[in-house]
C-alpha cells in the first residue's frame, strides 16, 4: 500500500507583490521526457544574465537592483519580467505612478504576463482603485486559475466594493484551492460576509 506524503504549502501572500523569480523558458522539445539536470548549479556572478544579476541583487534587497533591471531592459533580457520587478521596487518606494508605468510597460511587452496583472491589481487595491484592481485580479485568474492568492484578493476587493455575493463565491473558490491551514481564516470571513447580506 502506498503512502501519500503531503508537502507543506507556503501560506499565500495576500495583497503582496509577486516577484518574477526566473526567466520564462521555451517549452522543451520533448515534453514527455523529464530533464534530469535541472538542479542547482554553481555560477559566477559575471556569468549571470543582466536580468538574473538584477534578480539576485533584488532578492538581497540591494538598492542597485533597480539599475540592473534597467540594464536588463536595455539589453533586451527578460524585458517584461524586468519591468514587472521594477514596478515592485517603485511600489515599495510608494512611487505609484512610476510603478503603474513599469507594470503597464511589462504588459506592453507581454499582455499575458501573469505577475504584472497580479501586482498591478495589488497596487490598485492598495491605492483604493477597486474597479481596476478587480479587472486585473480577474485577468490574473484567467491566466493562472490555480493561484489561490488571486481569488482571495479578488474576494476582498469585491467585498470592499459592496459586491458581497460575488465576494463570497470567489472566497469559496479560494477555499477550494487553499491549504487546510487557511480554511479557518477564510471560513470566518465568509461567515461574516454571509451575515452582512442577511
List where the protein language model places each region.
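Alpha-helical segment of the N-proximal tetratricopeptide repeat
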Residues: 43-81, 88-92
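Structural signature of tandem alpha-helical TPR/SEL1-like repeats
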Residues: 59-71, 92-105, 126-139, 161-173, ...
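Long, contiguous interaction/recruitment modules in multidomain scaffold/adaptor proteins
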Residues: 1-48
Amino acid at each position: 500500500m502506498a503512502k501519500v506524503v503531503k508537502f507543506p504549502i507556503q501560506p499565500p501572500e495576500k495583497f503582496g507583490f509577486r516577484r518574477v523569480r526566473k526567466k520564462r523558458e521555451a517549452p522543451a522539445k520533448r515534453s514527455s521526457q523529464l530533464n534530469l539536470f535541472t538542479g542547482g548549479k554553481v555560477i559566477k556572478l559575471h556569468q549571470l544574465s543582466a536580468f538574473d544579476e538584477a534578480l539576485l541583487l533584488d532578492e538581497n534587497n540591494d538598492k542597485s537592483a533597480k539599475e540592473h533591471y534597467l540594464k536588463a531592459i536595455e539589453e533586451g533580457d527578460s524585458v517584461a519580467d524586468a519591468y514587472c520587478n521594477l514596478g515592485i521596487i517603485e511600489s515599495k518606494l510608494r512611487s505609484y505612478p512610476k510603478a503603474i508605468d513599469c507594470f503597464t510597460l511589462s504588459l506592453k511587452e507581454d499582455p499575458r504576463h501573469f505577475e504584472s496583472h497580479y501586482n498591478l491589481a495589488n497596487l490598485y487595491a492598495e491605492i483604493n482603485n477597486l474597479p481596476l484592481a478587480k479587472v486585473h485580479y480577474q485577468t490574473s485568474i484567467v491566466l493562472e486559475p490555480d493561484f489561490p492568492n488571486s481569488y482571495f484578493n479578488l474576494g476582498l476587493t469585491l467585498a470592499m466594493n459592496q459586491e458581497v455575493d460575488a465576494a463570497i463565491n470567489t472566497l469559496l473558490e479560494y477555499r477550494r484551492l487553499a491549504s487546510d491551514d487557511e480554511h479557518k481564516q477564510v471560513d470566518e470571513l465568509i461567515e461574516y460576509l454571509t451575515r452582512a447580506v442577511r
